[in-house]
């Protein structure tokens, strides 16, 4: 009886692992169907009790695997740009830009996961699939991300994604008007405006 219980437990674990692997493979396959795109987005942030914290909007340009431009326009403007090597974060309000190596950037943020779409990143999560919805839970509990959900169609179109942090704050993003196709290379370059303080952390 004990041997049977152990065998059943092992088989159950193998089945679950296979389901997670299949979900990860399907998610990556769907995202691979679109190599570059532009979309506008709306943002809604709520606290652990469901109270509204912030509403925002902006635009997103991606050329996988390492080029992207995340431009938040409201309520406060901010820009996150990767030229493939350097990751720039620019805050016009405080007139400051920060430069870090992209290779050193954390992979446990929803946007980085979507923009890079690398197998090594997805392998860090247990992934469950329900139709076009994918729910990701980090295998390691050391980061700030508690859960990540993304809805992506079979054609690779991302409709929405959300992230829940350890304190249960939720950030939800609705993407609309996704346009698949070539993106102007200028969207993936950044030159700090004159007078802006640059914090260069690449040294």
From Swiss-Prot:
Q: Which domain of life is it from?
A: Bacteria
Name a single GO cellular component.
outer membrane-bounded periplasmic space
Q: Which residues form the signal peptide?
A: 1-21
Protein location: Periplasm
UniProt keyword annotation of Glycosyltransferase present: no
InterPro entries reported for this sequence:
LolA/LolB/LppX (IPR029046), OM_lipoprot_carrier_LolA-like (IPR004564), OM_lipoprot_carrier_LolA_Pbac (IPR018323)
Q: Which Pfam families match?
A: LolA
> Which UniProt keywords are present, listed alphabetically?
Chaperone, Periplasm, Protein transport, Signal, Transport
Chaperone among keywords: yes
Q: Name one process (GO BP) from the record.
A: lipoprotein localization to outer membrane
- Main localization is periplasm
Q: Which Gene3D superfamilies match?
A: Lipoprotein localisation LolA/LolB/LppX
**Residue span of region Disordered:** 184-203
Family under the similarity heading: Belongs to the LolA family.
Q: Which HAMAP family has this protein been placed in? A: LolA
Subunit structure, per the record?
Answer: Monomer.
Extract the PANTHER family matched here: OUTER-MEMBRANE LIPOPROTEIN CARRIER PROTEIN (PTHR35869:SF1)
Q: What does this protein do?
A: Participates in the translocation of lipoproteins from the inner membrane to the outer membrane. Only forms a complex with a lipoprotein if the residue after the N-terminal Cys is not an aspartate (The Asp acts as a targeting signal to indicate that the lipoprotein should stay in the inner membrane).
Q: What is this protein called?
A: Outer-membrane lipoprotein carrier protein
Lineage, opening ranks: Bacteria, Pseudomonadati, Pseudomonadota, Gammaproteobacteria, Enterobacterales
Gene that this sequence comes from: lolA
């Amino acid at each position: 009886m004990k041997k049977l219980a152990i065998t059943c437990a092992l088989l159950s674990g193998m089945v679950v692992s296979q389901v997670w692997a299949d979900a990860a493979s399907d998610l990556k396959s769907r995202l691979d169907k679109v190599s570059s795109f532009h979309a506008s987005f709306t943002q809604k942030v709520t606290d652990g009790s469901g109270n509204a914290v912030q509403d925002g909007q902006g635009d997103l340009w991606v050329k996988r695997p390492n080029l992207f431009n995340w431009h938040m326009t409201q309520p406060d403007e901010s820009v996150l740009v990767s030229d493939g090597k350097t990751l720039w974060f620019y805050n016009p309000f405080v007139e400051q830009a920060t430069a870090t190596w992209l290779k050193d950037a954390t992979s446990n943020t929803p946007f980085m996961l979507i923009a890079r779409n690398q197998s090594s990143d997805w392998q860090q999560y247990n992934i469950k699939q329900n139709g076009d919805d994918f729910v990701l839970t980090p295998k390691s509990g050391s980061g700030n991300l508690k859960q990540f959900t993304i809805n992506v169609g079979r054609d690779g179109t991302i409709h929405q994604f959300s992230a829940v942090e350890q304190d249960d704050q939720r950030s939800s993003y609705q993407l609309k008007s996704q346009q698949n196709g070539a993106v102007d290379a200028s969207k993936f370059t950044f030159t700090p405006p004159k007078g802006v303080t640059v914090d260069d952390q690449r040294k």
